[in-house]
Amino acid sequence: MSSSKKESRNNAKNFIKNFSENLYPNSNRVYLNNSDKSIKVPVRSVELNRTEIIDNNNKIKYEENSPVMIYDTSGPYGDPKSLIDMKSGLNKLRNKWIIDRKDVELISKNLNLENKNNNFKKNIDHYISKKNRCITQLYYAKSGIITKEMEFVSIRENMNYEYSESEAKNNKKITPEFVRKEVASGRAIIPSNINHPESEPMVIGRNFFVKINANIGNSSISSSIEEEVQKLIWSVKWGADTVMDLSTGRNIHETREWILRNSPVPIGTVPIYQALEKANGIVENLNWKIFKKTLLEQAEQGVDYFTIHAGLLLRYIPMTSNRLTGIVSRGGSIIAKWCLFHHKENFIYENFEEICKICSCYDISLSLGDGLRPGSIKDANDEAQFAELYTLGKLTKVAWNYNVQVMIEGPGHVPINMIKENMTKQLKYCHEAPFYTLGPLTTDIAPGYDHFTSGIGAALIGWYGCAMLCYVTPKEHLGLPNKEDVKQGLIAYKIAAHAADIAKGHHISQIRDDAISKARFEFRWEDQFNLSIDPNTARSFHDETLPKSSGKNFHFCSMCGPKFCSMKISQEVRDFAKNKKIIDGMNKMSEIFKKNNNKMSLKK
């Protein structure tokens, strides 16, 4: 092991031992309850300072500012009172809910026992649905049953904010019944494998907050288990709603076990990667038997959603021959090579119903992968891309017949003027199943800055109705992202998702914006920092030029200085206008102006 790799691994080990870094000063962990207090939903509450008001008598008064609630994905890592032992894993939040429904049983022969080298202190029970019982959130929703997961989600999406009577009537308040209807219709999913009880329920659908996925995972030449667990914790602290483990290197199974047992968010995988490892890296040796065993192992382990490239058909492959960048999806290229070598139809497509049966036994959601997504803006919206999308729509109906939850994956590289067509066709072809896109990147000229190029596309497609955005880091096209890259990618995508929520008119999305704008106008610097998406960076930028604590009391920053601050001048104008005599005089002059037919009368 090289010295740099050893150093990275040791840094990750130290991070895991001391992961209590405070990313959000002046924030408290708050739990919101349902009516019988059987559910505790975590949110982050940002405490704000009072507003200083000078009345007409030149006396100082104070006005309280309510705390701002912020959606929190950090799970126990965001609660300073939590005692976490990585080798034991997180508490099983959903275990009682799952068992109380009385439709699961312990797995008699656990395939995961073949992988004993996981170093966990506790034996993990693994479940499967009882014979002739369906346990998916989609089945419950279609049956009119509101699950604890649905109730949890409704509280999480509302965060106890008050709604006006008209907003409540217009379905802006997200009730458990609203969640149930969205899941039942297929417009939303709640990824929740019964063998991942550590996860906190979340919903993916266009009528909810836009969600963010972070990709982590090792490669054959980089990273360790410790570094991937570090990235997991870092991801959820910075706001990842789900995490995909895309490991392609050594110890795939053990890496995933550590990630699952310590993850408060749903975990997705691309099973073909591990299946290829089982085939010794030789694509031609892949077959349905290997792939099925891989699915079962991951199902029993607790993976919440599978990305499978079932829509890439043999007859679509020639459509890519004139592309500038060919097939850029790793899973897609594997399937394409297998199909061409054997001159057979995609074995995932051929066995799709069997896959649905497996998923329904564990409540695993399917993320139908876009193996023919464009890898450059020149290839965007071509025949191959939309042929696959049309097939994914057909497969969606098949999965729904087995009560399996489905979302659809999308591009990729798409110029701004072609983005909306992707959303329009996805809704039409795929029956309004949630859309989950990688960006899209809107230009190909910025390696090292593709979190910007893709953030532009992500904000737009989120506005148009995309339910979840897969982040892109600065390392896209260049290398495996490290901890700092993960942070930068997540920040870019949290901004894009938030901008999309505002554009969609999500009722509570703008509360944070209004609070920070009010703090900015009132020169409450600490509140500005604490409400921002990255408080420590905002504070450090301010302190580069005004480092003293007294600088937090100034009514200006170093951009404009004390004499040219527009907000300071605006405040002075507002205070000046509060004088009743001035207002009366201005109103009087306004009436004179109107009587003179809107003409000025100048007296010498």
From Swiss-Prot:
GO molecular function terms noted in the UniProt entry: 4 iron, 4 sulfur cluster binding; carbon-carbon lyase activity; zinc ion binding
Co-factor binding details: Binds 1 [4Fe-4S] cluster per subunit. The cluster is coordinated with 3 cysteines and an exchangeable S-adenosyl-L-methionine.
Cofactor requirements of the protein: [4Fe-4S] cluster
EC number, as in UniProt: 4.1.99.17
Known pathway: Cofactor biosynthesis; thiamine diphosphate biosynthesis
Catalytic activity, as annotated: 5-amino-1-(5-phospho-beta-D-ribosyl)imidazole + S-adenosyl-L-methionine = 4-amino-2-methyl-5-(phosphooxymethyl)pyrimidine + CO + 5'-deoxyadenosine + formate + L-methionine + 3 H(+)
Keyword Zinc among record annotations: yes
EC category: lyase
PANTHER family: PHOSPHOMETHYLPYRIMIDINE SYNTHASE, CHLOROPLASTIC, THIAMINE BIOSYNTHESIS PROTEIN THIC
The protein, known as: Phosphomethylpyrimidine synthase
Species of the source: Wigglesworthia glossinidia brevipalpis
